[in-house]
């Protein structure tokens, strides 16, 4: 007999079955549901992230660690994190940062020696300026001077922009274009891990644009985590909600 299931309180649960998942190499978009074997009955899952290992994401639309489906009702997850779980940085011009961890069951998190960081938001675009180049007696004729692009937000995969975000910091925005005495607004700085991107600089014609919203450190997804360590503003950056 490979698996034994017992019905408890109307829920089928694996009896004495614990699925242990060891992450020992850097990985992206880790799907807990798939890695646990796409279970059809409740299961207990233990995820061990080795020291220094990074779990990231290739897109802000998908968390670094998540589930393509929630685990069956009654399941539990334990995450022992000695590495880093980090969402992708948001792209320039107000791109939203990615989520680091999305819960798929009732979860216990030991983050004592690890980090869980949401992706930084992308920096805002600089505002546009303009210059009237017509003579005093002629109808107005404008030259428009564009603002600079914002920087990418921080992430294991940094957001793209004038400067790409790094793991620990957002990328700098570009300076605005210059025409004669007129300068477009500068692009805003990409957000640090779990931090919104900065406003772009205002132009004389259009205002500055806001920075992007940071990704969550943990998307609760209706579940409530139990933290056994490492739940502080340094090791968990971004909202837990």
Predicted regions and their residues:
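Glycine-centric low-complexity/flexibility signal
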Residues: 45-46, 50-63, 82-222, 233-241
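Intrinsic disorder/low-complexity segments enriched in polar/small residues
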Residues: 9-10, 36, 138-139
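N-terminal segments that cap or nucleate solenoid repeat domains
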Residues: 17-64, 225-232
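Exposed regions on extracellular, virion, or secretory-pathway luminal proteins
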Residues: 11, 38-40, 72-75, 210-211, ...
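Extracellular disulfide-bonded cysteine-rich modules/repeats
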Residues: 2-7
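Glycine-rich, low-complexity segments
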Residues: 8-20
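Beta-solenoid repeat scaffold
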Residues: 69-82
């Amino acid at each position: 007999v490979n698996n034994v299931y017992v019905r408890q309180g109307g829920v089928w649960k694996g009896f004495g079955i614990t699925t242990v998942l060891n992450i020992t190499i850097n990985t992206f978009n880790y799907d807990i549901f798939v890695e646990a074997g796409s279970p059809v009955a409740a299961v207990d899952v233990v995820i061990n992230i080795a020291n220094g290992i990074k779990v990231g994401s290739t897109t802000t639309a998908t968390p670094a660690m998540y589930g393509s489906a929630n685990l069956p009702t009654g399941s539990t997850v334990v995450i022992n994190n000695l590495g880093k779980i980090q969402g992708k940085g948001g792209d320039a011009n107000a791109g939203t940062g990615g989520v680091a961890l999305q819960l798929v069951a009732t979860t216990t998190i030991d983050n004592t020696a690890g980090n869980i960081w949401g992706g930084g938001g992308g920096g805002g675009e600089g505002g546009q300026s303009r210059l009237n180049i017509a003579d005093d007696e002629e109808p107005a004729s404008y030259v428009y001077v564009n603002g600079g692009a914002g920087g990418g937000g921080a992430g294991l995969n940094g957001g793209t922009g004038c400067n790409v975000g790094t793991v620990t910091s957002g990328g700098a925005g570009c300076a605005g274009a210059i025409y004669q005495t007129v300068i477009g607004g500068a692009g805003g700085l990409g957000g640090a891990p779990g931090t919104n991107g900065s406003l772009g600089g205002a132009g004389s014609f259009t205002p500055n644009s806001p920075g992007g919203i940071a990704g969550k450190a943990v998307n609760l997804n209706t579940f409530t985590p139990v933290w056994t360590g490492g739940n502080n503003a340094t090791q968990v950056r971004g909202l837990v909600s």
